[in-house]
């Protein structure tokens, strides 16, 4: 068994800075060549502390950014202009990607479409709400105004 210090997050194994024991072949053929880990040494403990401190700083910064973006998203409604019939029924449906593009077009920052949750299928003109998961601890509810366009 090889004792390693992870330098990147590895699914099913651990996060950056964790000290793990893996089989020799996994270490030699996968983790070490891809620079996902370093061999453990006594001096490596100092490296572990610096990696953990950097990870904590990144987490804190991403949390602050997510909170700022959540406040901006909740400050004003986002307008989506979509094709609709005379009765207000849409040609198609509003998807997560449409919401993400509308948020970016409104100047409220860029969000990943996978973080948008639509509680109902939007198939007609009107006002709706969407949930956006910006961080594991931060979620925002945004108002969507779906209007008919050309």
Curated annotation (Swiss-Prot):
Belongs to the bacterial ribosomal protein bL9 family. One of its GO terms (biological process) is translation. Binds to the 23S rRNA. It comes from the Bacteria. Keywords: Ribonucleoprotein, Ribosomal protein, RNA-binding, rRNA-binding. GO terms for cellular component: ribonucleoprotein complex; ribosome. This is Large ribosomal subunit protein bL9. HAMAP family: Ribosomal_bL9. NCBIfam families: L9 (TIGR00158). GO terms for molecular function: rRNA binding; structural constituent of ribosome. The lineage of its organism: Bacteria, Bacillati, Actinomycetota, Actinomycetes, Micrococcales. Pfam families: Ribosomal_L9_C, Ribosomal_L9_N. InterPro entries: Ribosomal_bL9, Ribosomal_bL9/RNase_H1_N, Ribosomal_bL9_bac/chp, Ribosomal_bL9_C, Ribosomal_bL9_C_sf, Ribosomal_bL9_N, Ribosomal_bL9_N_sf.
